[in-house]
């Protein structure tokens, strides 16, 4: 199963928290791993802010190698901003969802892995496939 990951689903793979079980289920069922490349910055910020130990940094390093990274070039930023006028998500969440939608045009069975309530709500309303 091809999965597009949001940061809210990656961090629970590294830290034991509320969504760890769901994240592990997605991780085990995933065959293709996709994410917006900004996820690296968000995840490493989470690791730093939580004062991650060396084994957690190593775990992130291994997980990050699985991903095919989606870049959103500057010439698409206006489209993201325009789309988000309707979506009304936090900026990074809008970009994650925009990148997901873009990859869906190539991989129509792609599923979004997120534990962000606003993303889940919007994705459900828009008919995006969720894990």
Task: Enumerate the language-model features and the residues they cover.
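Short active-site oxyanion
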Residues: 1, 30-33, 66-68, 106-111
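Active-site-proximal, substrate-binding regions of enzyme catalytic domains
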Residues: 37-85
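Alpha-helix/helix-capping structural signal
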Residues: 8-9, 38, 117-118
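Active-site neighborhoods of divalent-metal-dependent phosphate/nucleic-acid chemistry enzymes
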Residues: 69-118, 128
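Short, well-structured N-terminal submotif of metal-dependent ribonuclease cores
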Residues: 1-35, 49-58, 128
């Amino acid at each position: 199963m091809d999965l597009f990951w949001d940061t809210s689903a990656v961090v629970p793979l590294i830290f034991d928290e509320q969504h760890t079980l769901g994240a592990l289920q997605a991780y085990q069922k995933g065959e293709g791993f996709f994410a917006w490349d900004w996820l690296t910055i968000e995840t490493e910020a989470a690791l730093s802010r939580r004062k991650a130990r060396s084994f957690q940094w190593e775990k992130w390093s291994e997980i990050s190698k699985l991903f095919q990274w989606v870049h959103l070039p500057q010439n698409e930023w206006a489209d993201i901003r325009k789309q988000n006028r309707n979506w009304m998500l936090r900026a990074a969440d809008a970009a994650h969802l925009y990148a997901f939608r873009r990859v869906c045009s190539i991989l129509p069975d792609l599923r979004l892995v997120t534990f962000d309530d606003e993303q889940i709500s919007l994705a459900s309303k828009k008919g995006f496939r969720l894990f």
